[in-house]
Amino acid sequence: MRKVFFLLLFVPGVLQAQSGQEAARTANADVSGRWVVNTDFYGTTIYFRMELKQEGEKLSGNFDGDKLEGTLKGTSIYFLAKDEQGGTDEGKATFQGRTITGTVVFTHTDEAAHPETHKFTAELVPTRRAGTPQRHEFTPTTFYRQFSAANKPVLTISPGDSVHTTTVDAGGTDEKGVTRVLGGNPETGPFSVETASPGDTLVVHLSRLRLNRDWAESDDSVVGRALDSDLAVKMKDGGKTVRWHLDAEHGLATPEKPAEHLTRYAVPLRPMLGCVAVAPNVAQAAPGTGDSGRYGGNMDFNEIVEGATVYLPVSVPGALLYVGDGHAMQGDGELNGNALETSMDVEFTVDVIPGKRIMGPRVESATHIMAMGLEGSLDDAFRTATANMAQWLTDEYKLTPSEAAQVLGTSAEYKVSEVADRNAGIVLKINKERLKSLASAGK
């Protein structure tokens, strides 16, 4: 099976990025450190992660998660990494200062007779900036409709920094009712996060999600995944836009022109973000902002609210964080195809967990940890959510597979988060109270 590549070199004992130490570093030939490796795949830069440790002339570590061994002689580097299927990544390079340049030969088990050779340049990951975290006021003027690594960052921030900004609604309309951009979940961002590198986890804490206008729009239809043939016939005349009044003072939303039986119908406001995303691996075409996947995206999960923390796997340097698609509230699954779509006032704080590789989006609230699965079918989404949570339990709580199965079997709570878009969403939740009793919880 062909590997999907993103490379970052990580090694214990990263030296400070001080220009005066470059010559000394080369002379001492110390390649220990975290590196981002930019590899040229036919004109497209693909990013990799590697972790190296140097002991004399011996190198060890991992390359894109695969065990690596190699040598450093003078400024010449050789390494060989092997995956579990027998594929290899063989590199030859030269080291100078904070840069490694060379070639890497990828040999895949299913194409062993046709190895691929590509040039690369690797640079040390910058160290985390010292000092007090900053709060940034950002007024968006450009909104993107793809979760792309090619989009120019609108702002560069550091781990620990906060950003206060706004989003337009799914149709591209702002808080004043002015259409700013074509619809389709246009996003605010991307925000580049210093030190975030492939193989890390980006942490996004939503400290503020507030309505900034008094109306929203939705629909009067039900999406196809939720319809049987009889209900589809009954719903054939649906699809009309329904405008809702948002009463922030009383915390309620009501249809502005209610039909006969909805004249007293009101639902509680619970502002949320439908979209929180990082740029996906550039080996794939950039997805539109209506899509979702391992990178997050249009997840439409109604527990991504004020106070929640979202965890996303980083695939490109800087992570490139996007936010958008505000909902005044939404039922499970986003059954109308649109929730109560509205613009939003947003504040978030970012952090980076170096070297932590998670398989997909996760959310944490005051009471629960939540693992998401976003796939083409509900069955596949169910499996992915379960695997995502199992990884969380084994990595963070040090459970064995047997122990994880027992916890899942007694504590799992499943929610259908999304059925409106190409990918369906399932979320597996576990109450934190259940986890407090685990022997590893305090370690």
Question: Where does each model-flagged region fall?
Answer:
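Short, structured beta-strand/loop micro-motifs enriched in basic residues and often containing a Trp
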Residues: 139-148, 180-187, 287-295
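Short, conserved secondary-structure segments in the cores of folded domains
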Residues: 153, 189-192, 300
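Glycine-rich anion/phosphate-binding loop at the beta-strand->alpha-helix junction
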Residues: 201-354, 387, 394, 401-402, ...
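Central antiparallel beta-sheet cores of small beta-barrel/beta-sandwich binding domains
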Residues: 18-112
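Sec-dependent N-terminal signal peptides
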Residues: 4-12
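Short, well-ordered loop/turn sites that connect or cap secondary structure elements
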Residues: 157, 193-196, 304
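A hydrophobic, small-residue-rich beta->alpha segment in the mid-to-C-terminal subdomain
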Residues: 356-402, 406-407
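N-terminal, Lys/Arg-enriched amphipathic/low-complexity engagement segments
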Residues: 130-179
